[in-house]
Amino acid sequence: MYSAAHITRQPKPTRAAIGTILALGRPLHRITVEQYHTMQEQGTIRKEDRCELIHGYILEKPHIKPPHASAISRVMKQLLSLLGLEVVVRIQLPIALSDSEPEPDAVLAEGSDEDYDDRHPGPADILFLIEVSDTSLDFDREVKLPLYAGEGIAQYWILDVNARRVEVYTQPRGGKKPAYRKTAIFTRDDAVPVVVSGKKLGSIPVASMLP
C-alpha cells in the first residue's frame, strides 16, 4: 500500500491537465516513478495492460487503430532516411521524466542504442518527440504538451491524422503554466523541416507521414 507522504511530495500537475484526464474518463492512481517500476517488476502492471505514467497517474493508453499504426510506421521510415548512426529512433518506448514515464509514438535521442541499455532517455537526451493523434488529440495537446514543455524537451510534434497536418512546438517554457513559445502548422502539401541542435537535416513531406 502506498503512503500519502510519498504521493504528496510529487510535483503537482496543472489544473488543466487534471481536467482533461477527468474529462476523458481515465482512472486516477497517483504514485511515484519508483512505485510504478516496482509494480511492473512484480507483475501488477503487465506489458499487455498498455498504460503509462503521466504526472504520477497510471493512465490506460488508447487502443492503436490502423491509421495510427500506419502513421507511426511511415514516420519511422522517413526519420531513418534522414538520420545518421549518432541518433537513436525509439518507437513507443518509455522516456524518463520527473514524475512521469510516458511512451511517445516516436523519440529521437542523442547517442547510440548502447547508451540506453540501463536507462531510458531523459529530457537532456531527447532531440524531439512525436505523438500521432487520431483519437487522442485533446490529451496530446492539453496534458502531454505542457508535460513535455515543463521538462524542457526542445521540440514536440503532433501528427494530427484527422486534420491531415503536423503541429510543431518549439522553445519550451517552464513555470506554473508550461507551454511552447512557438508553434508552426504544416498541412498536407507542406514539408516539415527536421532541425536537430540548430542544424537542418532535411525535411519530411506531411503527406508521406499520413495513412
Model region roles, listed by residue range:
Residues 1-211:
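Gly/Pro/Ser/Thr-rich low-complexity, intrinsically disordered segments predominantly at protein N-termini
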